[in-house]
Amino acid sequence: MVALTDSPQPVIHAEALTKIFRDFWRRPKVRAVNAIAFDVRAGEVFGLLGPNGSGKTTTLRMILGLLTPTRGTLAVFGRSPRDVASKARIGYLPEESCLYPYLTAREILNFYGRLFNLRRAARQTCIDQLLEMTGLQHAQHRSVGEFSKGMARRVGLAQALINDPDLIVLDEPTAGLDPVGCRQVKDLILTLARRGKTVILSSHLLADVEHVCDRVAIMGDGVILVQGRVRDLLEQPDRCRLTFPTLAPDRLEAVLQALRRETGAAPAVDHPTRTLEQFFIETIGQVRSEPTAPTGVAPTGGVAEFLKSQPKQTSNAQHRTSNVE
């Protein structure tokens, strides 16, 4: 988790936000989002959770300006979500990576860089770093149509970051990725948050959400059922857990007896375990310690340098030009 940036104005502000889909005759058909309210602050990783059909994707699309709210208030960077200046500060990874299948990974990133009017030199530097970060440098000249789902997902993640956005919206970012890729995405999210970036994460993998999110909102049937800090929602204040080096059997029994006298209950004793993700990454790391000639993904474990630089004090104008080469 990261320290949240104190800001007088939230990056996203929603109040009584409602979206009603209508039929051909303009009659109300589905109330997908029903009068929800939430704020997302700068430097925060905010999780938007809920089962299928709960209204998560509709909410994300309204934030991105792809859908117009039926009623209520929604502001992104203090402006309408449809404002072009706001959109230029957003990076978006949709649930399904819709990429041009006949373009290579490099060509796709170059295309998106041109859309953001990035200068050629800056654009190529960002592309090189993103390809290395996502482990696709060895496959950068292959058509994306030949990629596996996981490799295509990495290209989608790279395009979402090409403009060094201030707000990153990630819809199921780890879908199709192997455990190493999932760990890299989580580390990347934490790095972006430390830079003061704001991240909205929607995922059904709750372990990932728990690991990286500062706050979450859980939706159901178009409303927010609960929202708050992850730690506050999950903490069990009536229980306590102790971790200490293994003791000799007689010393351990003495400690347990003291706990039984104090609490009147039988304490549970076990040994700490690593997560399966940690064990998997350690095992794969040993296999990959020997040199090979990768043909697909070759993860570096690093983060693109331009994403690790100091937070921007001004807009990206110095990296852009009206004449795109």
What are these regions (language model features)?
Residues 4-9, 100, 118, 182, ...:
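A general boundary/transition motif marking the beginning of the first structured unit of a protein
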Residues 9-201, 206-220, 225-226:
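ABC transporter nucleotide-binding domains
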Residues 1-29, 289-316:
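ABC-family P-loop ATPase nucleotide-binding domain
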Residues 107, 131, 135, 238, ...:
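Generic secondary-structure transition motif, activating predominantly at the C-termini of alpha-helices
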Residues 3, 41, 92, 205, ...:
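Exposed, low-complexity/repetitive linear segments and helix-based recognition motifs
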Residues 316-325:
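Arg/Gly-rich low-complexity intrinsically disordered repeat tracts
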Residues 138, 152-161, 172-176, 232-235, ...:
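Short, surface-exposed, charge-dense and proline/glycine-enriched linear segments
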Residues 230-297:
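Short, charged/small-residue-rich alpha-helical element at the C-terminal edge
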